[in-house]
């Protein structure tokens, strides 16, 4: 799959939180924030895709929903990786592989 297509298929974890948890359960961002003991702006920014899910937020989401915190972090990590790989300004083309370095004799011990 082309990298640009991957970018179109990945959802921000906040969108998943909103579409698969909050809306079906009828929970507002305000109510979630209050129950989790975090500022409403934090959860609002996550739901709007302006902020990522941190370890602290993942633990709180896990406790609130009875889910594994790691699952929230995995969603964020997957999103971050795909976005980073598909950024048009990605500078990874300048990174040489270990094979390229050793074949060129540039590997310093």
Predicted regions mapped to residue ranges:
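Short alpha-helical DNA-recognition segment
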Residues: 26-45
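Short, charged recognition helix plus adjacent turn
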Residues: 73-109
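The alpha-helix within a helix-turn-helix
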Residues: 22, 33, 62
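Short, basic-rich loop-to-helix N-cap that marks the start of a DNA-contacting helix
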Residues: 50-63
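Alpha-helical structural signal
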Residues: 18, 43-44, 69
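Base-recognition residues in the alpha-helical recognition helix of bacterial helix-turn-helix
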Residues: 45-48, 74
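The DNA-recognition helices of helix-turn-helix-type DNA-binding domains
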Residues: 39, 50, 65, 76-79
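A short, Lys/Arg-rich alpha-helix, primarily the initiator
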Residues: 2-27, 74
């Amino acid at each position: 799959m082309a990298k640009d297509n991957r970018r179109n298929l990945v959802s921000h974890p906040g969108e998943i939180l909103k579409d698969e948890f909050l809306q079906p359960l009828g929970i507002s961002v305000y109510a979630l924030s209050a129950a989790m003991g975090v500022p409403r702006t934090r959860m609002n920014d996550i739901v709007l895709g302006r902020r990522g899910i941190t370890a602290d937020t993942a633990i709180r989401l896990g406790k609130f929903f009875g889910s594994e915190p790691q699952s929230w972090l995995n969603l964020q990590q997957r999103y971050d990786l795909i976005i980073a790989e598909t950024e048009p300004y990605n500078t990874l083309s300048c990174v040489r592989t270990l094979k390229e370095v050793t074949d060129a004799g540039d590997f310093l011990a």
